[in-house]
Amino acid sequence: MKILFEFIQDKLDIDLQTNSTYKENLKCGHFNGLDEILTTCFALPNSRKIALPCLPGDLSHKAVIDHCIIYLLTGELYNNVLTFGYKIARNEDVNNSLFCHSANVNVTLLKGAAWKMFHSLVGTYAFVDLLINYTVIQFNGQFFTQIVGNRCNEPHLPPKWAQRSSSSSATAAQIKQLTEPVTNKQFLHKLNINSSSFFPYSKILPSSSSIKKLTDLREAIFPTNLVKIPQRLKVRINLTLQKLLKRHKRLNYVSILNSICPPLEGTVLDLSHLSRQSPKERVLKFIIVILQKLLPQEMFGSKKNKGKIIKNLNLLLSLPLNGYLPFDSLLKKLRLKDFRWLFISDIWFTKHNFENLNQLAICFISWLFRQLIPKIIQTFFYCTEISSTVTIVYFRHDTWNKLITPFIVEYFKTYLVENNVCRNHNSYTLSNFNHSKMRIIPKKSNNEFRIIAIPCRGADEEEFTIYKENHKNAIQPTQKILEYLRNKRPTSFTKIYSPTQIADRIKEFKQRLLKKFNNVLPELYFMKFDVKSCYDSIPRMECMRILKDALKNENGFFVRSQYFFNTNTGVLKLFNVVNASRVPKPYELYIDNVRTVHLSNQDVINVVEMEIFKTALWVEDKCYIREDGLFQGSSLSAPIVDLVYDDLLEFYSEFKASPSQDTLILKLADDFLIISTDQQQVINIKKLAMGGFQKYNAKANRDKILAVSSQSDDDTVIQFCAMHIFVKELEVWKHSSTMNNFHIRSKSSKGIFRSLIALFNTRISYKTIDTNLNSTNTVLMQIDHVVKNISECYKSAFKDLSINVTQNMQFHSFLQRIIEMTVSGCPITKCDPLIEYEVRFTILNGFLESLSSNTSKFKDNIILLRKEIQHLQAYIYIYIHIVN
């Protein structure tokens, strides 16, 4: 990367000392801005150079830029920042006329006087080459902005979405769909309420084996536009499918279910609701038995193939929420020639026949794991995560319905009323209401459940497109505006937006106390509580009052899409920024994405009113609207709750600290934490919480209110939003049990390590390895918890991959990288080599202990870790002797 001044001289071989054009412009100095762009802009070549457009010789400066934009657009190079906001208008009068639906600031800048002079200085060819084949980044004294080139200097290629849309073949899309990763979404959260049968197993497969049903089933498994089946093979496949349907008709599903996964005896009161789940191992056994009795032996092909399919079935049932299995892993180690029902044995096995067999096998395995197995699972089990976790649990439908029926009856009676004026629940455009489907999630507390409203997205593709447009142009901008209004409002307490900020806020409070009390913490009083059924209890009219108050000093909103590239982590994130309120940090590269939405104050009010007053829950053939409160799951519910509970903290004087006292109040959603030197204030807040916050219709969960003192018990640790807080020393850490195991599914070891580094960075972003907050022992304990989590993710990611020399070298580089990240985040290590040694040892030893559970698999990694620890011990031995 070179500054433009050097780029002109080195790349273009222009001697600025003797160039007459430059000298003439230089006389004007800063008045024309040329000198500024030469010294503040940097050029970086694209790794994939492309041909330049052919331009007429008489074009103006602005016309040259427009032609470059058209050239990029026609080549579908939409990642180039010059194309952002532009489209090509095509009609019978105009062939290639640029249309700009949002102002592109970069193009406006390039069309200015300074860049026009630069154009005249270097010539049109060099100027166009710079626009097409380079990235230009400008520094404004505070941060960097990309003004030319592909986003983050990506190679010249159409973006993936353009490649997908340019493929006119529906067949190509269907083939791609066949080989996409397999997820558990097909069988999650499938309610079976008020059905004539708890287990409608007749719908798993057609109940008849007529020619039409056989043909329909065959074409569902082997789409005719994807694979050609010779007539003789059709007969063979039909015979196998006929056996399948006959077995289905004779199979006593419920008897097998009761034998393997029997309903638990006793009433709901006798057992906790979570203890009534069917163990995953039993569910697996049930599905295996069903498949063995349902599928003819030839469909498996062989015992080896059956074993592989069963192994993958176990992986499917073990997937966490949002987990997936790469499709090629389902095919791995399957012997295609064992699927004899998919080819004619007396036909010579040519390359073409093998390719056809391969395609048939892909279709069959895809159908098995995307259709048949999910249908079997969802027919007999309600599959769901437990609230705030990602592990999937399984309940028999009859057991689940018994558990939730009392809750649903009470919920509908208390909060909902039937919507008698709605007659079109399925349509997004023809109904005056926003319909949502009901999802029920069990909580950890006994017999407690959470209802989530999942927005319906329309009855067909056309309505889905309209839904997406409204979500992009109205809902998402309004969500960001609500967050902007919340952030802008001055409050007496410090607002936090994520659990990653908890430790930082407590550190600031702790440092303030230590400074005030001569490096000794005073006695502190803690209280935490959460609001009972917070979404259901939110008063909607109060919501609108708070919103309208927040809008009084506003004059509309511009919501602009902007990219921010973190140069430290290599992560590129897209943000919707309201009224230019986000300023790039010094380590960020700013890339304007141009797309802008403008909403007036009344627009915001209209969108919010539609969301909170006209969202309906669609259950079977009826829909229900709320009497009050909000549906959890709506895009706007969470920011509305934040606005309301911020107002609650400002309204009640009990939350205001006395002038001579120090109080920290943290609120995240409906969870509240108070830490204060003022015992009376905590007593007053507890009394208020016990009685309820009447103005806001909010009641605290009385059995979850916790109040402790730092002097009452030396070992008291409280949890707040999955963070552990040691009350005596005001130290904070995150336990490994609160960290989800991130499932990385990739065949690329390089990609796996890249994901692990990003995950490690997320884990230490909670800022709990700061010695201004925590003691050295707590810092080391936190590092150990993080390493436990990362090492488990590592073992899971390489479960089916071999550990070779290349991987071991990558593992070594990975260790060095996370050690560097940890040392960088723990400044005391720079002052004390012994602490740095302990940090390094904690990381290395943590991996060693974890990988030692499978010494045969990770033998090379273990040898490497032991050598690294020995080198570290030798180094510290020498250091101690030198110091002494």
Curated annotation (Swiss-Prot):
PROSITE patterns noted in UniProt? RT_POL
Show the catalytic activity: DNA(n) + a 2'-deoxyribonucleoside 5'-triphosphate = DNA(n+1) + diphosphate
Q: According to the UniProt entry, what is the EC number of this protein? A: 2.7.7.49
Kindly list the places in or outside the cell where this protein is found, as annotated in its UniProt entry: Nucleus; Chromosome, Telomere
A single Pfam family, by name?
Answer: Telomerase_RBD
Instruction: Please report the name of this protein according to its UniProt entry.
Output: Telomerase reverse transcriptase
Report any one BP term from Gene Ontology: telomere maintenance via telomerase
- Additional comments on file? Deletion causes telomere shortening and senescence.
Q: What is the lineage of its organism?
A: Eukaryota, Fungi, Dikarya, Ascomycota, Saccharomycotina
Q: Say yes or no: keyword DNA damage present.
A: no
